[in-house]
Amino acid sequence: MAPEAAAAFLSRLERLFHPVGDWGEFRRGARNAAVVFVLYEAGGRWEVPFVRRRADLRDHPGQVALPGGGVHEGESAWDAAQREVAEEIGVSLGSLVPLGAGDPIYASVSNFSVVPFVAHLPAPVPPFVHEPSELEGVLRIPLERLLDDSAWVESADPLRFRYLAHEESLVWGLTERIVAGLAPKLRQALDPAPGV
């Protein structure tokens, strides 16, 4: 993507999403968490890193997730999100450029209230280094694939759910809900109507 087009895309995202400091509030009584939908350019396209959680973890074992985690006492959601990205995939604190936040999502199975932030990781993008005590690895998924409705499959399982297969992993559950919630504004920023 040409530098001017990339800058315009990022600027539109800032206008479309909630401000980082004014995204709303967590669900009362839930465990608070924050994740980051990190956009970076690789080979002329936008990509997003996801983490594959270890199978022996208590919460969401073996699942693919956006980097993020719990918000500590006295910590803002954005500060928690940046800390977790640094811990989980090795992106230095202060490297992310915040673009905004999506609407919080509640996961009743684990009682997490999650705010998804959108951020840009400018070049040069460092190699992602995952935290082995929590994660099995890092997946890099092209934004175009995440926004392609035909790439998402509806399961035939009685518990019907949507998923995206990528590198022998599935993006589903809470992470699918987060991506689906962010997708309309991401699409709008990529292909804006006149005047947007």
Predicted regions and their residues:
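Amphipathic alpha-helical blocks and their helix-capping loop/short-beta junctions
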Residues: 129-158
